[in-house]
Amino acid sequence: EVLLEGPSGVLFKDGQKKYLPPGVKIVLLSKAGAVLSNGDNVQF
């Protein structure tokens, strides 16, 4: 779950921080993780 999303990054509920390059967004979010528009995956 996303706790906070801003133009330069995302803070997930579990405390993970992911810095995002300009223009990159979350395209898919589930209980297991997130997929970003640049193809990166974040697992939680």
From Swiss-Prot:
Protein keywords: Cuticle, Repeat
TM ranges: none
Start-end of each Sequence repeat: 3-20, 27-44
Pfam families in the cross-refs: Cuticle_1
Molecular function in Gene Ontology: structural constituent of cuticle
Disulfide bridges in this chain: none
InterPro entries documented for this protein: Cuticle_1
Lineage: superkingdom: Eukaryota
Tissue: Calcified shell.
Protein name: Cuticle protein CP463
Organism annotation: Cancer pagurus (Rock crab)
